[in-house]
């Protein structure tokens, strides 16, 4: 009897920590993931441009918002200090094709567009999968495809884990990716912009980072802060399968974390993709209430 009671208590405790089943709510403009009735995240397919913002800041095809299990949105979009920053997004400030340079980071030259998307629920509602196919185009001509995969897990213990992958393929001509042109910076690749917050703390495997960082390799980075009085954190982990070893990361206390690829070292500051030979990058993200 005692053993049965203990098993019941343990089962009840697990249920308290587990969320309701995940489900997708789809519209022509976005896919929303919900855990029961609670919003988890949205992927925005349609062009986004709030009233009063310059037309050249229009964009699509990124994650925003992303909420913790207790409902704190940690992502920012159209922040006045960097209007081109947009939730969780894949972008490079230098994309070279056919002798021309384009800036996906700052929304100049290359245009992103969605081609298709497929949302699934697996494991009895414990896992959600979103597969997205986007393109980059110049003057209406497609120059690259982007296959994005997002796997989102049911929340547990006040946290939620997501795995994210990009497969980028040049189409008819070689495509060169570089980070920032500034000598001491190398942002470009996988990027996260944070919502307005207070008491920001950034950590890596080396401990608390008191200053902003560029060009330093890190296996993970986390930003914790107070959002309207509620403490939450987002952590990025590099996948060991990614090319290039431990990546350089861009850490900004104004509210930005980025994983730089290919980074900037004396040995390499660019990577060229040959047509039909894809590049795949993988990262995991964990959001948590503190």
Residue ranges and their predicted role:
Residues 1-8:
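Bacterial N-terminal signal peptides that target proteins for export
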Residues 8-18:
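Hydrophobic h-region of N-terminal signal peptides that target proteins for export
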Residues 9, 83-158:
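Extended, loop-rich substrate-binding clefts of extracytoplasmic carbohydrate-active enzymes
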Residues 19-87, 165, 174, 180, ...:
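Beta-strand-rich N-terminal accessory domains
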Residues 43-46, 54-56, 155-203:
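Acidic (Asp/Glu-rich), glycine- and aromatic
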Residues 180-232:
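Glycine-rich (often Gly-Gly/Gly-Pro-rich) flexible segments and glycine-rich loop motifs
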Residues 234-290:
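Beta-strand-rich recognition/accessory modules
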């Amino acid at each position: 009897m005692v053993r049965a009671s203990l098993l019941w208590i343990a089962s009840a405790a697990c249920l308290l920590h587990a969320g309701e089943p995940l489900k997708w709510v789809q519209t022509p403009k976005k896919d929303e993931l919900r855990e029961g009735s609670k919003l988890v995240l949205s992927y925005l397919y349609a062009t986004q441009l709030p009233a009063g913002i310059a037309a050249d800041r229009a964009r699509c095809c990124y994650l925003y918002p992303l909420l913790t299990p207790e409902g704190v949105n940690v992502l920012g979009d159209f922040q006045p200090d960097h209007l081109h920053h947009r939730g969780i997004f894949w972008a490079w400030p230098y994309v070279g094709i056919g002798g021309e340079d384009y800036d996906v980071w700052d929304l100049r030259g290359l245009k992103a567009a969605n081609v298709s998307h497929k949302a699934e629920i697996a494991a009895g509602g414990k896992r959600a999968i979103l597969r997205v196919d986007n393109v980059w185009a110049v003057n209406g001509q497609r120059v690259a495809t982007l296959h994005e995969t997002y796997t989102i897990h049911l929340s547990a213990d006040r946290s939620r884990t997501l795995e994210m992958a990009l497969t980028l393929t040049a189409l008819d001509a070689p495509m060169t990716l570089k980070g920032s042109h500034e000598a001491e910076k190398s942002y470009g690749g996988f990027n996260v912009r944070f919502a307005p917050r207070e008491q920001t703390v950034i950590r890596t495997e080396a401990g608390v980072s008191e200053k902003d960082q560029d060009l330093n390799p890190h296996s993970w980075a986390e930003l914790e802060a107070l959002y309207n009085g509620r403490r939450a954190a987002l952590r990025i982990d590099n996948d060991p399968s990614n090319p290039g070893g431990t990546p350089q990361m861009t850490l900004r206390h104004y509210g930005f974390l980025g994983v730089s690829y290919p980074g900037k070292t004396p040995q390499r500051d660019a990577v060229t993709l040959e047509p039909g030979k894809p590049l795949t990058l993988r990262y995991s993200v964990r959001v948590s209430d503190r």
